[in-house]
Amino acid sequence: MKRLSLVSILCLLLALVGLGSCSESTLSKDILGEWVGDPKILKDLEWMGGGQAKVYAFDWKFDNGNRGLIKVGKTLTMREEEEEVYLRVAIVVPIIYNVYGDGLSFRFDKDSVQVEILECLINGKNYKDVVARDVEGEGEAAFQSACNTVTEQLKELVEEDVHRQIGTPLEITYSYDASVKNDILTLKQGRKIPLTFHRKKSQGATAP
């Protein structure tokens, strides 16, 4: 009679009581790469929107070494006195993640949030046109310096907005049941609506 190893016995016991499986999960490999958020989930991102802010993109990237990124595309409108500022921004938040069986947990690397200003309108006009009018006659160097100053100030405002709206979530470790099937990543958390993401195709890929 073939002698059972301790591992075999343990696996058998786990299977009998329904606590586990000896088949190794492939999630840690399947999850690698870039994922694009399903548009329908963008309306239900409680901690990324609200007020005058709207989320138009919500993507993930998982690298080797338990590091990754969450990329958020967001528009927001700010009003101060007689000026209205419309911003379209990209927010990149690095994450540290862990895969365990069919589960995924992650936390934000809150000190490494990056903000890029993609578009800025002041009272409906491109901010560079507004700056050019204000520094007219002062030369190209003055114009570039003023544009850089405005951009940096806007980044600071957006970073403050991000930390204000998701400050508490940045401190939390999130856990999800995760699965990858047919190039679709699904994240489930209790009774909440599942989040679904499609694997990002390489730029050179073409449809068959």
Regions found by a protein language model. Give the residues of each.
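Bacterial N-terminal signal peptides that target proteins for export
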Residues: 1-9
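Bacterial N-terminal signal peptides
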Residues: 8-18
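N-terminal helix-cap/turn-to-beta initiation motif at the start of protein domains
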Residues: 22-36
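Low-complexity, serine/threonine/proline-enriched polar segments
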Residues: 92-166, 170
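N-terminal glycine/threonine-rich, aromatic-flanked beta-hairpin/loop signature
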Residues: 47-122
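Edge beta-strand at a domain terminus
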Residues: 95, 101-103, 161-208
